[in-house]
Amino acid sequence: MTDVTVKSLAEEIKTSVDRLVQQFFDAGIKKSQTDTVTQQEKEKLLAHLNRQQGTVDNQLTLQRKTRSVLNIQVTGGKSKTVHIEVRKKRTYVNPSVTKPEAPLPEEENAQIPKITKNTFSQESLNKTSPQKSLKTKAIEKAKIESPKKERHSLKEKQKKEAQSEKARREAEASSLKRFAEEEVRRKVEEEAKRVAEQARKMAIENEAKWSELVADQIDSVDYHVTTSEHARAAEDENDAKVEGDRRSRHRGTKTTKQKKTNKLSESKTDREEARAVVRKSKRKPSALQQSFNKPVVALNRDVVIGETISVAELANKMAVKGSQVIKAMMKLGAMATINQVIDQETAQLVAEEMGHKVILRRENELEEALMSDRDTGVLTVHRAPVVTIMGHVDHGKTSLLDYIRSTKVATGEAGGITQHIGAYHVETENGMITFLDTPGHAAFTSMRARGAQATDIVVLVVAADDGVMPQTIEAIQHAKAAKVPVVVAVNKIDKAEADPDRVKKELIQHGIQPEEWGGDSQFIHVSAKVGTGIDDLLNAILLQAEVLELKAVKSGMANGVVIESFLDKGRGPVATVLVQEGTLNKGDIVLCGFQYGRVRAMRNELGREVISAGPSIPVEILGLSSVSSAGDAVTVVRDEKKAREVALYRQGKFREIKLARQQKSKLENMFDSLREGEISELNIVLKSDVQGSCEAIREALQKLSTDEVKIKIIGSGVGGITETDATLAAASNAIILGFNVRADAATRRLVEAENLNLRYYSVIYDLLDEVKQAMSGMLSPKYEQKIIGLAEVRDVFKSPKFGAIAGCMVVEGLIKRSSPIRVLRNNVVIYEGELESLRRFKDDVNEVRNGIECGIGVKNYDVQVNDTIEVFEIIEIKRTIS
């Protein structure tokens, strides 16, 4: 037997080369895929594999596949090709193992050669070989002579019994499988028969039901059918006659071989079509009768209508055309298009008018269900008052609070002014007070309004030396709108120019009456610098809180309001929340406006971690999905999944409202498009450190817009300036304004590459002033006419070059050459042009001053004596935005 390589052996036994090399290595033989394998190495490998398996296999299984193609005739004379694959599997068993002989003496057992799997395989595959037959007989003879055959036969017998048991089980399993398949096929056939029987019965019923209508239709067309039958019969007879004549002419000329060839060349499809034609001609002619069941009763549907619905969607739910819905609305006196959105009441009237049942659905059902499924306590306890400090900018609000808290907050504010809402709670001898410090700048109106809404008492700080200012009046209006009591703190009382009585008189004009003058507002004279009157102010606040009898539920799920929110680079979205009811715990699921999340961490105003927060306690929470809007209500809920759905619903609703507000009438859009070329736009990308400052700056910038220059906020947000902001600014030709934020290195490189305008600010004054300057540069210049001289015409001369030359006397100002002029006659402008020639004693001059005679040439115009020539110049005036 020739040696083979490892690779060819692997292909022969259908295994991978790497696996065969590993098996050789496990058997103690080092081989590569190009090495040859001897017969002894094969036997050694086989013995190793037998030892691993624990048994010597005495079976050989052969598999064979045969493929064939079957052509099946289908309806219409066409043939269908079906591919058939037959798989056969046969197992051969070594007879020397299955038929053990009588036991032999044990002494001769050593003389028996070892029979391997390779030997069995060779004998099974080469039964016809005479050499193999002699070898088999020799082996059997050796077995008979062996004295130890008894033990070997016993082992082989046990193996045979195990194999026969295995074969029996496999046969039983296959028979059970065939039985199950037959059962499934039988059930499928029965179901198909049942469905066919039902269809047949239904067809019989329908035929009986509509037989009368069909009979009437047949009677109406019977004449035409009969005529067509006679025509077809005559045509068939004529065709048969022609075909018979043709066959009789060619019958004698065709030979047997030609007939056979024609028959073979005729396709099977043609013969099938011919048979079909013959069968069709033998059948009686029938009229094709088809009919459809017209619904006689209108279908009443249950139509679910939300708060708003479009006409097309309403028609789709009622399964009617949109035109029918529009007709029904016109009958009710409402005009609408198919894409128009109508309200719930109108849709209900239309649907009920068309005979459908209406089910009204509130779109905020999920939100209401989520809010109702909350644990709220019933036991109320006294809570600390929430005090908002309001007043004009630089009147000492933060300094006053700074003295109360004994910290240096005011020195840390940019520009010395507050630009955020700060929330702090202070422990005093008489109780705890929560303070909200609001900005006093005019741009932070919305932030002051939020502070007034979330507060119990307003402390109005007025500087004794400055009196009532615009933001002081605005703070009074916010307090009155929120129906909150006001405690007036007259600050800077230590200054020499302080005048508290003037402050009282000015506040009386705006509805703030002091107690000593018969009103209900307490006036406390304080000095945030030296600490005068601070204790009196705290006592006044606590006294006012006792009068209000402030109570809140301490147990149960918490409710609160967002005071401020911002995006921290390391911690993510952070919201400053003032708890109003219940207890906010770490790990609670909160719904906050358009955002939701789980409270991952809570910190107080000092930056320390806390586990829970009760009523009137401000905390910073981490874990929201995004930066929330300041002023949003914070609610603790049970289900995070439902909270997410409610947040997404709110976002979609807000988007719809925003789009509806942005949509203008067609007439306004038409006028806007006509004025587009006249209006300049200043595009701005705004980034701020907190949400409240971002909103305040947006409102302040939009108020700067004029009829000629419009401020357009392309993008705004909270957090640092990113590459996305720079890309947006480059695409829209906008400037980037950063308020208390910075750009990272990658963004700065992009800004330099795109040559963008990036500016940083920490004080809102500077930001607004520079934006005003940029807007002033975009204004179109203004031109004015300035009269620089007057000349009276004393005489007129003729010139061949210029025509009429006016001899003039300069009576006012000076006359410049090449300046625009007007000719006035009886104080009426009759000509406007340019001064062509200016001479003095026949010499060309550039200008002539007052009291000097000169000659003025006016081209192509007839100047008369006593006319007045007015010389002027056009001056460009630079415009600014106030």
UniProtKB/Swiss-Prot annotation:
The lineage of its organism: Bacteria, Pseudomonadati, Pseudomonadota, Gammaproteobacteria, Enterobacterales. The gene is infB. Belongs to the TRAFAC class translation factor GTPase superfamily. Classic translation factor GTPase family. IF-2 subfamily. Residues 116-133 have a biased composition (Polar residues). Residues 437-440 are annotated as: G3. It comes from the Bacteria. Disulfide bonds: none annotated. GO terms for molecular function: GTP binding; GTPase activity; translation initiation factor activity. Residues 391-398 are annotated as: G1. One of the essential components for the initiation of protein synthesis. Protects formylmethionyl-tRNA from spontaneous hydrolysis and promotes its binding to the 30S ribosomal subunits. Also involved in the hydrolysis of GTP during the formation of the 70S ribosomal complex. Residues 491-494 are annotated as: G4. Residues 416-420 are annotated as: G2. InterPro entries: DNA-bd_dom_put_sf, EF-G-like_DII, IF2_assoc_dom_bac, IF2_II, IF2_N, P-loop_NTPase, Small_GTP-bd, T_Tr_GTP-bd_dom. Residues 137-172, 229-246, 263-276 have a biased composition (Basic and acidic residues). Residues 247-262 have a biased composition (Basic residues). It comes from Hamiltonella defensa subsp. Acyrthosiphon pisum (strain 5AT). Its main location: cytoplasm. This is Translation initiation factor IF-2. CDD domains: IF2_eIF5B, IF2_mtIF2_II, mtIF2_IVc. One of its GO terms (cellular component) is cytosol.
